[in-house]
């Protein structure tokens, strides 16, 4: 990425990373449109692609950080944005496939408020797991397993990215 300005590098990195994650959102809606019903095939494909994209994203970030020194604030902001994107995508899968148990309160999401899906994904992703929402179907449990694995890996990956950035480009020492 030599010869590019920092803003150009960020735009290129964003295109490489964000666009595939956004395209992943098409899967749950495509299944209903193309097949006419929910067969869960695209759910399984989508969850597999989440792991593949996660690995590619980590590889791209490591490569990006190897070539230039970056301020830690950008790494932190990127980490938070990436966390929100992952949880949002997993929430879309949970909403579209209706993977959480029903509640007596009617809403546009087949019986659960939208915030419950996002709350469930965040709590599972951070491996807190309060236990107030428990998936009842095999597909819901599979989503919980994938979310917990990604969440546990995500924290370790963030530490590895920070350490890699610091070891490649240690902070300058004050000479006084």
Predicted regions and their residues:
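Transmembrane alpha-helical insertion/packing segments
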Residues: 1-55
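Membrane-interface segments at loop-to-transmembrane junctions
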Residues: 3-8, 71-81
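Membrane-water interface at transmembrane helix exits
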Residues: 28-32, 62, 66, 93, ...
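Transmembrane alpha-helical segments of multi-pass membrane proteins
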Residues: 46-49, 75-89
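Alpha-helical transmembrane segments of polytopic integral membrane proteins
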Residues: 54-62, 89-93, 97, 127, ...
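Membrane-helix interface/capping segments
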Residues: 56-77, 99
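Outer-pore turret/helix-boundary of cation channels
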Residues: 84-119
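Pore domain of cation channels
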Residues: 112-171
């Amino acid at each position: 990425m030599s010869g590019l300005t920092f803003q150009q590098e960020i735009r290129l990195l964003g295109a490489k990373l964000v666009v595939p994650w956004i395209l992943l959102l098409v899967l749950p809606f495509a299944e209903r449109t193309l097949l006419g019903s929910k067969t869960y095939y695209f759910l399984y494909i989508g969850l597999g692609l989440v792991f593949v994209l996660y690995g590619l994203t980590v590889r791209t970030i490591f490569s990006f950080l190897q070539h230039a020194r970056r301020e830690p604030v950008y790494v932190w902001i990127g980490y938070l944005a990436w966390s929100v994107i992952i949880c949002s995508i997993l929430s879309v899968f949970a909403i579209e496939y209706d993977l959480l148990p029903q509640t007596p309160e009617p809403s546009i999401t087949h019986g659960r408020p939208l915030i419950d899906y996002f709350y469930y994904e965040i709590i599972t992703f951070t491996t807190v797991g309060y236990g107030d929402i428990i998936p009842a179907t095999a597909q819901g449990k599979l989503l919980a397993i994938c979310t917990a694995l990604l969440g546990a890996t995500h924290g370790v990956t963030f530490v590895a990215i920070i350490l890699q950035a610091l070891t490649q480009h240690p902070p300058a020492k004050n000479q006084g």
